[in-house]
């Protein structure tokens, strides 16, 4: 399960991964992190966090990592971009 802050980030990730199949959760706002934590607790060993590389994303990621200790933060793969969508847009060759 891969958790994203926004829908465009999830679509961008799917574009980057091509045919690889994943299950996704889109928060649509970091204010939904508490609800997401409760829903994700049964999946403890299978959670990747890919929230935004900004202050709100950092706070939400820390809170989720505290509540879901086996979750893995994968935001670094898209640094220094703010999020996956920005990463995709800045690396597209037309």
For each feature predicted by the language model, list its residue ranges.
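TOPRIM fold recognition
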Residues: 15-94
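Conserved Lys-Pro-Asp/Glu-containing loop-to-beta segment of HAD-superfamily phosphomonoesterases
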Residues: 1-5, 49
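Helix N-cap/beta->alpha junction signal
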Residues: 5-8, 53
């Amino acid at each position: 399960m891969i958790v994203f802050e926004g829908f465009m980030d999830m679509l961008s990730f799917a574009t980057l991964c091509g045919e690889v199949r994943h299950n996704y959760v889109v928060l649509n706002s970091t204010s939904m992190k508490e609800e997401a934590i409760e829903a994700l607790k049964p999946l403890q060993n299978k959670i990747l966090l890919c929230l935004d590389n900004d202050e709100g994303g950092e706070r939400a990621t820390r809170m989720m990592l505290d509540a879901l200790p086996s979750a893995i933060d994968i935001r670094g793969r898209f640094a220094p971009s703010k999020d996956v969508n920005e990463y995709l847009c800045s690396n597209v060759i037309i």
